[in-house]
């Protein structure tokens, strides 16, 4: 019975190690991708584009059209309320 427990423990440890190693590999890939994105933004800025505006466009493109429209309407409402229009 003790052998079964030891084998189960060994399997659990191996599985845990595999999960951790996968996460570590993915974190490294994420860092590499993040560095690549920073390089693209640097190129973008070097070409005369406004990186802040491009980030806003990218954020908006991730949203559904109805979400964008709702956000724009709320922003316009707030701007009107503050006399900014």
UniProtKB/Swiss-Prot annotation:
InterPro entries: GapR-like (IPR018753), GapR-like_DNA-bd (IPR046367). It holds the Pfam family GapR_DNA-bd. GO terms for molecular function: DNA binding. It comes from the Bacteria. Belongs to the UPF0335 family. This is UPF0335 protein BH15140. It comes from Bartonella henselae (strain ATCC 49882 / DSM 28221 / CCUG 30454 / Houston 1).
């Amino acid at each position: 019975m003790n052998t079964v427990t030891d084998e189960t423990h060994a399997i659990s440890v191996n599985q845990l190690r595999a999960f951790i190693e996968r996460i570590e590999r993915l974190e490294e890939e994420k860092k590499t991708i993040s560095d690549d994105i920073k390089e693209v933004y640097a190129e973008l800025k070097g070409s005369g584009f406004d990186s802040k505006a491009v980030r806003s466009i990218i954020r908006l493109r991730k949203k559904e059209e109805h979400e964008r429209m709702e956000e724009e309407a709320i922003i316009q409402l707030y701007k009107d309320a503050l006399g900014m229009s």
